[in-house]
Curated annotation (Swiss-Prot):
This is Serine/threonine-protein kinase MARK1. The modification Phosphoserine is found at residues 219, 382, 390, 393, 403, 423, 444, 475, 588, 666. Residues 1-41, 377-498, 518-699 are annotated as: Disordered. Residues 60-311 form the Protein kinase domain. Phosphorylated at Thr-215 by STK11/LKB1 in complex with STE20-related adapter-alpha (STRADA) pseudo kinase and CAB39. Phosphorylation at Thr-215 by TAOK1 activates the kinase activity, leading to phosphorylation and detachment of MAPT/TAU from microtubules. Phosphorylation at Ser-219 by GSK3-beta (GSK3B) inhibits the kinase activity. Phosphorylation at Thr-613 by PRKCZ/aPKC in polarized epithelial cells inhibits the kinase activity. One of its GO terms (biological process) is regulation of neuron projection development. Gene3D superfamilies: DNA helicase RuvA subunit, C-terminal domain (1.10.8.10), Kinase associated domain 1, KA1 (3.30.310.80), Phosphorylase Kinase, domain 1 (3.30.200.20), Transferase(Phosphotransferase) domain 1 (1.10.510.10).
């Protein structure tokens, strides 16, 4: 993979009738078919009858749905041979037209040739006649976007650590002649160690010097001025502009360019004027002036940006340099020996690795080089469906590799630095104490498609982060001090606003694009319909009353691999945020209005995990759905986020919310709230007795979503939470011993908010905390009710 394989360049005009697939949207270079052995084998050892019922795809036991759309769904899965967690994206090829399939496979092909520690990585491709399965790593840190929503702007030291990784990864793509074209906060993921992973290569393409690209794609607030002008471009320069917007966003928590509609946004981008916050350093301001340059010819190259003073503050002896891709370790004797015990032949292993087949053999080899999943709360590795029976706590101690100097950052949550302890190909030593399951000889096929390809919308499928191939020390983590700072006006942006998700879209032809972007045609953008898979609200409110508006997610027309988190409440109602909290993917029941000062502001329809691609001619045919922006008030800065979040109102989250929705009496149903789980779950005191005192709260490593902490007994905390919920007329259902699913508001008035409250253990602080996690509803409505409840809790 170190030698770049030339990619066929897809004609930029060849994209009409494009239909996006959750994050995979551009070209047909068929991936290697999976071997016959890949027909869904099972792990023989340590499988109980319960786990036996779980569906399989290849060597992966599917567990939870973490994203779903019209043509694809994403499942959290576990590799039965190694026990590693992965994300499996299941795409129904029969629903895609030839152009969409071509783009889908181009994205897969591009992902195969990228090998950088800060870019998501593909593990395995399994293709059948009707379905494509993409196996990727699942990341637990969530999006940078969600991080900003929850915590506000980053301090420059923290932003620098992240931005160095972003620049390194993008420059690596450019040196391989690949342009991303959809760089934004939503497409930047964080792994368990808070390292950046760039995701969603659905709009990426190969570029060649002298040949211009002409597709206008990406999210408008991050789009370069030449795109708004309908000009052709080389490629890298549009990514450089987007990086400038990202840097501004990291440091300020708001966008440098924004508008109430596309016309206003276009005018501001073409002016190139943006507000410099008082707290921004001069060095950072100077770097922005190199990135956000109107003339693309004068815009700095990433090689020049790497040498910038701000980029290297604190790294004077390890100036950021272009990433040198290491030689792949294709002959790790320990991993190969383990695979032989699983039933793989040595010749088969060698052939798969040398040919880079991305089949079950290569995937197993790569996964063996990655650190095993960490189990909290004393969970045993032999439980559930794991085939890896035991794992010494020190099994990876000797596998730490030195991270590239330009990617080294320190972890702020503790005094000692913790390095990433694994590498995909320069694999760690595998301790002999770890035993793995033999590969079965007989292959059974279990179709996992019991669920229909739902039209239930999920929150954007995010992108699964994929393993780094060289070691990187952890980026700064969030500690308790960070939580406090989010409530501080000094570290929060302007009040009343909200950082909104932005739609990524495509105009293929310059004539169509030009028409769509003219002053008199700003309404053409409003004719875009909502994406086929709209996402549910997923932002996390700050830890307390904040004077800063929150980031509203940019919705892209191309989908993401997936965002990772832990399992969710139910199949079909999960999400991927850190802390194992579960999100319910579904259409948001509310149209989100952030500020009373902009009641009649039109809004971009909430996009989806797989973002629909829009073309110039399609713009004229689709109904109005205006681009949302902040009020055009002189008191608002150009970069302030004041966008409304809007979800499709076609349905409330099925399976869960039906019991909470207020019904209109005229529909023949009982008015008021339907029976709540609170009523059906029985007396809380009786339930406490029934479940016994042995149950313990789940342990969390981080305090990101903690509204409050206490030394009180968890059962007493749970009773206090119920008391406050009752006092605020909130409905709730006890999903687990210390987990409540809560609902407040009226769906008919678009004020319905759904969230989780969980009592968790914080072992590092020797305290218990209350974790809040929004599932649906506007970020402002959630923040209001969550803050009210948190303030009333007497813990």
């Amino acid at each position: 993979m170190s030698a770049r394989t030339p990619l066929p360049t897809v004609n930029e005009r060849d994209t009409e009738n494009h239909t996006s697939v959750d994050g995979y949207t551009e070209t047909h270079i068929p991936p290697a078919k999976s071997s016959s052995r890949q027909n869904l084998p099972r792990c023989r050892n340590s499988i109980t009858s319960a786990t036996d019922e779980q569906p399989h795809i290849g060597n992966y036991r599917l567990q939870k749905t973490i994203g779903k759309g019209n043509f694809a769904k994403v499942k959290l899965a576990r590799h039965v041979l190694t026990g590693r967690e992965v994300a499996v994206k299941i795409i129904d090829k029969t629903q895609l037209n030839p152009t969409s399939l071509q783009k889908l496979f181009r994205e897969v092909r591009i992902m195969k040739i990228l090998n950088h520690p800060n870019i998501v990585k593909l593990f395995e491709v399994i293709e059948t006649e009707k379905t494509l399965y993409l196996v990727m790593e699942y990341a637990s840190g969530g999006e940078v976007f969600d991080y900003l929503v929850a915590h506000g702007r980053m301090k420059e030291k923290e932003a620098r650590a992240k931005f160095r990784q972003i620049v390194s990864a993008v420059q690596y793509c450019h040196q391989k002649c690949i342009v991303h074209r959809d760089l934004k906060a939503e497409n930047l993921l964080l792994d368990a160690d808070m390292n950046i992973k760039i995701a969603d290569f659905g709009f990426s393409n190969e570029f060649t010097v002298g040949n211009k690209l002409d597709t206008f794609c990406g999210s408008p607030p991050y789009a370069a001025p030449e795109l708004f002008q309908g000009k052709k471009y080389d490629g890298p320069e549009v990514d450089v502009w987007s990086l400038g917007v990202i840097l501004y966003t990291l440091v300020s928590g708001s966008l440098p360019f924004d508008g109430q509609n596309l016309k206003e946004l276009r005018e501001r981008v073409l002016r190139g004027k943006y507000r410099i916050p008082f707290y921004m350093s001069t060095d950072c301001e100077n770097l922005l002036k190199k990135l956000l340059v109107l003339n693309p010819i004068k815009r700095g190259s990433l090689e020049q940006i790497m040498k910038d003073r701000w980029m290297n503050v604190g790294h004077e002896e390890e100036e950021l340099k272009p990433y040198s891709e290491p030689e792949l370790d294709l002959s790790d004797a320990k991993r190969i020996d383990i695979m032989v015990t699983m039933g793989f032949a040595r010749d088969e292993i060698n052939d798969a690795l040398v040919s880079q087949k991305y089949d079950e053999v290569m995937a197993t080899y790569i996964l063996l080089g990655r650190k095993p999943p960490e189990f909290e709360g004393g969970e045993s590795l032999s439980s559930g469906s794991l085939c890896q029976r035991s794992r010494p706590s020190s099994d990876l101690n000797n596998s730490t590799l030195q991270s590239p100097a330009h990617l080294k950052v320190q972890r702020s949550i503790s005094a000692n630095q913790k390095q990433r302890r694994f590498s995909d190909h320069a694999g760690p030593s595998i301790p002999p104490a770890v035993s793995y399951t033999k590969r079965p000889q007989a292959n059974s096929v279990e179709s996992e498609q019991k669920e229909e390809w739902g039209k239930d919308t999920a929150r954007r499928l995010g992108s699964t982060t994929v393993g780094s191939k060289s070691e990187v020390t952890a980026s700064p983590l969030v500690g308790p001090d960070r939580k406090k700072s989010t409530a501080s006006p000094s570290n929060n942006v302007y009040s009343g606003g909200s950082m909104a998700r932005r739609n990524t879209y495509v105009c293929e032809r310059s004539t169509d694009r030009y028409a769509a972007l003219q002053n008199g045609r700003d309404s053409s953008l409003t004719e875009m319909s909502a994406s086929s898979m709209s996402s549910a609200g997923s932002t996390v409110a700050s830890a307390g009353p904040s004077a800063r508006p929150r980031h509203q997610k940019s919705m892209s027309t191309s989908g993401h691999p997936i965002k990772v988190t832990l399992p969710t409440i139910k199949d079909g109602s999960e999400a991927y945020r850190p802390g194992a909290a579960q999100r319910v993917p579904a259409a948001s029941p509310s149209a989100h209005s952030i500020s009373a000062s902009t009641p009649d502001r039109t809004r971009f329809p909430r996009g989806s995990s797989s973002r629909s691609t829009f073309h110039g001619e399609q713009l004229r045919e689709r109904r109005s759905a205006a681009y949302n922006g902040p009020p055009a008030s002189p008191s608002h800065e150009t970069g302030a986020f004041a966008h409304a979040r809007r979800g499709t109102s076609t349905g409330i989250i099925s399976k869960i919310t039906s019991k909470f929705v207020r019904r209109d009496p005229s529909e023949g149903e009982a008015s008021g709230r339907a029976d709540t789980a609170r009523g059906s779950s029985g007396d809380p005191k009786e339930r406490d007795k029934d479940e016994g005192k042995e149950a313990k709260p789940r342990s969390l490593r981080f305090t990101w979503s903690m509204k409050t902490t206490s030394s009180m007994d968890p059962n007493d905390m749970l009773r206090e939470i119920r008391k406050v919920l009752d006092a605020n007329t909130c409905d709730y259902e006890q999903k687990e011993r210390f987990l409540l699913f809560c609902v407040h508001g009226d769906a008919r008035q678009d004020s319905l908010v759904q969230w989780e409250m969980e009592v968790c253990k914080l072992p590092r602080l020797s305290l218990n905390g209350v974790r809040f996690k929004r599932i649906s509803g506007t970020s402002i409505a959630f923040k209001n009710i969550a803050s009210k409840i948190a303030n009333e809790l007497k813990l």
